[in-house]
């Protein structure tokens, strides 16, 4: 019996001292079984116990397909419990130690990394706003019964009330097709600011914050829960002459074609002013003074005036860019023209209540104006004696036009032209000292130094080239409509100060690069203090102190996927970088870029920017989208006046149109009355390929075409194209009474004259009449119906998304 025990012990000892041959990445290592097994539940204990299948080479050694250079210090740690880096970076070694499950080594390496990283951030970290509470949803029995009535196709338009379901498209009255990409309700989609206020837009609600010197940042207002996902947001922290006094603030959000506007008091109470409809998806939402302005690339402008409480929708030429100057809204259009609207004199045409839209300038090459920037010089007065406009075109040209005091009667004159871009210009900025342009080739930036004499741009010695660099920024494959608005690269800052770009290299990252817009020089890089993914960002100046001599400070606000908002002091960062002259770094270095791309696979494509997709080994819930700068012009052709972005898209859209390819349907807009659905989620497509008799004829400004491409998990709506690049016309006659449609359009459409008005009361005179445009039919608040009167009270006709329900026959989502 004793001999048996001795034999068993000897066998056990021999087993623990067994020599193990390893082949790690082609390099052979010899060690003992005891060395590999002393850490429980590690890779080696599982391997040698048979829980993991082994692969042996020709010599019988266990093959492990890992880096041998990183394995050497790990094996040395298993032998001696001491760490010798042997030239391997701590980050790489920690990654390998995590793979092998060497827990004691991982803890040591994490502690080393914590020496340089703090949960309180760096010297630039300014503050942290925790995630707010999500407002409760109100679902009533009345709403549920309303759902049943709508599903029975028995309700009238405008009676919808919210039940919290996703919008749906009706097929043949029996089945439905769900639309929309699910969005994390905790993620900050957009951050916007004005003066000492910021607003954070989440998926279904918005939160306003205010800063005071004594108390810091405080949450002031939280909107009600919305059934629709927010895509645009605007904030006005200084409302003069508003309905509730000068201390009111206004915040607006947009989802698809609907806009909700709230009034917020200093005390934190808020009230809904109204719900408005643009009729087509909203691409931009902003304030000009007291006016709330919404624009769509399809060629619609909506304006709401805080004093008159009036909502006006105006048809214009399809819009490709915009900018504001004082009380003026300037529109760059796809026919090569620049128009302006005077918001201070809104509305001017009392005979039909149309906005006064005047053509300011027409591009000599008839190229679409894809980027626009207006600079009001200090010499500009009420008489409008000097103004400068820089714009970029679809062919890559950058032009500067100026209004001289001597040329008031003849309109602006072409001052300079630069043809340095081979891709469409997507952004442009004319400031006091620099001209900055960005094109679609991986956000390629060209900058010039602007020479001025007495505040006015000068030709002696003229604008001189300054820098050329790129702001590489990849986007998600199936991103929400708010992504382009919440992740705009800039440039940010006042035009008489240094401006900055914010570079977010990959969509799933916790790091941003802040760079000078003039030279591309890196000012700083910021990393989330809690290591969460940055989902949105913006740069604003806030007046933290009211003391005499204090200056506003510039802050970078970052929204995160966990709902928090983090703040960074860019004023300090710029002061620090100005003191050090030895830092010449710009964007991420090659090593930094490769590190950022560790979690991504770049797919091959013919695009100017490679598509980005998640590595199969680290696949996340969020899919990645091709870069916004991914479509390059094949050959430069004139963009005809009739063409629209929703039709041919021969080049990459401006940032204003970045979401046009994945926009939702154009609802019931009379010029876009159907969708050509290629596939469905909830029901199979019949053999004939038609979804039902709801398909109708689609019209666009370029002629008849299918709806612009829509990307969603369940449906795709794409614009038909012929093999030669032209439009493929999709026509159906089912479910449509053509004579009735024609007569309705004839009643609603009438010609609009564009009065020859000067910019700034005589500064600019329009040269031509605008092509035939139609004003949207409307009625006045008073209830008198006439084709030329103002639109009715928006709260009477347009239901709020808070009460909007999933309907299968309503105008908002009907086919």
Swiss-Prot record:
Subcellular location: Cell membrane
One Pfam assignment: BTB_2
Major localization listed first in the record, in broad terms: membrane
WD repeats, residue ranges: 225-272, 277-314, 316-351, 420-458, 538-578
Known tissue expression: Brain (at protein level). Expressed in the liver kidney, and heart.
Bias kind Low complexity: ranges: 774-800
Domain (BTB) ranges: 18-87
InterPro entries assigned to the protein according to its UniProt record, in alphabetical order: BTB/POZ_dom, SHKBP1/KCTD3, SHKBP1_KCTD3_BTB_POZ, SKP1/BTB/POZ_sf, T1-type_BTB, WD40/YVTN_repeat-like_dom_sf, WD40_repeat_dom_sf, WD40_rpt
Location of the region described as Disordered in the Swiss-Prot/TrEMBL record: 707-815
Keywords annotated in UniProt: Cell membrane, Membrane, Phosphoprotein, Repeat, WD repeat
GO cellular component: plasma membrane
Similarity field: Belongs to the KCTD3 family.
Functional summary from the UniProt entry: Accessory subunit of potassium/sodium hyperpolarization-activated cyclic nucleotide-gated channel 3 (HCN3) up-regulating its cell-surface expression and current density without affecting its voltage dependence and kinetics.
Protein name per the record: BTB/POZ domain-containing protein KCTD3
Species this protein is from: Mus musculus (Mouse)
Lineage: Eukaryota, Metazoa, Chordata, Craniata, Vertebrata
Primary gene name: Kctd3
